[in-house]
Amino acid sequence: MLTNEQITSVKGRGFLRNRGTECFSGRIVTVAGLFTPDQLHAIAECSEKYGNGKVIFTARLAAEIVGIPFDKIPEAEAFMAERGLYFGGTGAKVRPITACKGTTCVYGNIDTQALAKVIYDKFYIGMRDVKLPHKFKIGVGGCPNSCMKPSLNDVGVEGCRAFSFDSELCRGCKKCAVAESCPTKAVSVVNGKAVIDTSKCTSCGVCVGKCPFGAVPKEAASVCRIFVGGTWGKTQRMGTLLNSVYSADEVPSVIEKVMLWYKENGYVKERLGATVDRIGTDALEAAIATDDLITRKDDILAKPLLERQ
């Protein structure tokens, strides 16, 4: 019979016990769930050789090889490592990075896969040894359709468009192409001019370039908005939307500041959203508005985690 120490030791390496057995499911993590044919062949071969022949793809886009006996785990790890693949994705640290298909999707406002790769390298790989108060999930979505649910991640990135509207160029068409294209019905024609209801507009970008007279320009910068503190499961919390919007190049720096703030202020076993609620969104916004957290990075990472008194 396996001991709790044995079960815990492999859980930290990406192996979760299968209920009622002494076998485990091992998670293979890639960049935002992108797999090459060779990687898929390797996963299938590992499943047949060391598991029960079944593979499950998780909600965070990892490939989970089912039914690996405890004593075969080292062999499975070595087999996959020889093929450039590794088990992981568990524990109180950065979890597998998820991203939608915004890179190729017609609604994608940003290159989600490219941004996810940067985040994967910097945080999932670069900070894999950093122990955080709790799990830390990062998701990248290409548009407000929210297929990847950015607002339910500890940090969620959502691509949108920083478009503008020039009322002087609006001719008040009876059939306004901008209004017709708007999925949230945020545009209406009032007294011969298009009016945009900002409370309904999601900056999805669908209307960009639709006006033949240029009231909505054909080009609009792609930007990112960032949600922090989202959770789903036994406790639900929609992520708090940060006040600013950011370029894709600025996103990794913001994520790093949020993570350092969480490392410094979060209690052990407290999710980021609970830390934000306890300390306040204004405090987080103020902290990430400067580079102080980055300057103190080494000290913050070296400090022990906070325990509740």
Predicted regions: what they are:
Residues 16-17, 155-159, 224-233:
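Short beta-strand elements
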Residues 1-24:
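Intrinsically disordered, low-complexity polar/charged tails and linkers
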Residues 175-195, 202, 206-223:
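Iron-sulfur cluster-binding cysteine motifs and their immediate structural context
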Residues 231-268:
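A hydrophobic, small-residue-rich beta->alpha segment in the mid-to-C-terminal subdomain
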Residues 285-309:
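Long C-terminal interaction/binding lobes of large macromolecular proteins
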Residues 2, 24-173, 200:
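Small-residue-enriched alpha-helical segments and adjacent helix-cap loops
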Residues 15-20, 51-57, 185, 231:
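Short, flexible, solvent-exposed loop/turn segments with mixed acidic/basic and small polar residues
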Residues 52-59, 90-92, 129-135, 190, ...:
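Flexible, glycine/charged-enriched surface loops at secondary-structure junctions
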